[in-house]
Amino acid sequence: PCDWSSDVCSSDLVSIGMVGTSLSGVTFVSVPGMVRSIDMTYMQTVLGFFFGYILIAKVLLPLYYKLQLTSIYSYLDDRIGQHSYKTGASFFLLSKIVGAAARLYLVVLILQHYVFAYWNISFAVTVVISIFLVWLYTYRGGIKTIIWTDTLQALCLVAMLIVIIWQVKDKMQLDFAGMVQTLQASQHFRIFEFGDWHSTQHFMKQFFSGIFITIVMTGLDQDMMQKNLSCKSLKDAQKNMYTYGFAFTPVNFLFLSLGVLLLTLASQQQ
């Protein structure tokens, strides 16, 4: 899957790893939680994501490979100038540092509370150890290690999503067919909104928002695109983008379905 003598990885591995990058523990709360207020209309945005990935594969990836970029922000240097390059790269670093720090803080806090506190290890030591481990595996393995860990994260998150849905199904005393019928019968099983143009959930608004969100958050994001640039060729990178977009759609559908099932379970227990 990965050539460890270089920065080259297979497109299938990269696409799974990108799913892992897009998902997190926050996804388990935020996406199912949307169902209560907007039903399953978020799927309209997800469909826009898919077409956004196609545009990235057809427009941005050929450009990046043609210029043989290792950093997508160097394109700003070529087209606009050094100041735009530094500005784009600086905002990327700032956003990633803040986001990574918040996630790391949450993980370290949990480890400290449930594990290291019993060994009388201070919080500062836990932080230093965690940062050192992150630095060690990225420094020794580079982009290949990042892709492998993202892939493992994706598999674990999707597996846990399926397990949670199955546990909720059993809690509701349903078989698989009964679960599907429950989803279809729910008032929250509303995916498309075509009637009210003034609604923020109107299909056209959500669909095109999804396209532009994908272009900005994936196509112009170094963290995501460096994984595509690790593929052997442009064709492999495009295949990865198509696979990633295709896989991301059913995963979001499962998260929204979980939200419907949880709302149904909550109403039954009131």
Pin down the residues of each PLM region:
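Single conserved hydrophobic/aromatic residue that forms the stacking wall/gate
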Residues: 1-8
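Hydrophobic, membrane-embedded alpha-helices of multi-pass small-molecule transporters
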Residues: 9, 13-29, 130, 141, ...
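Transmembrane helix-boundary motif of multi-pass solute transporters/channels
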Residues: 12-48, 109
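Small-residue-rich segments of transmembrane alpha-helices in multi-pass membrane proteins
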Residues: 13-18, 79-88, 153-166
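Helix-loop-helix module between adjacent transmembrane segments
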Residues: 19-20, 43-139, 209-214
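Membrane-embedded alpha-helical core segments of multi-pass
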Residues: 27, 52-59, 68-69, 129, ...
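Short amphipathic alpha-helical coupling elements at transmembrane boundaries
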Residues: 74-82, 89, 145, 181, ...
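Hydrophobic alpha-helical segments and their helix-loop junctions in multi-pass secondary transporters
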Residues: 97-104, 108-125, 139, 152-192, ...
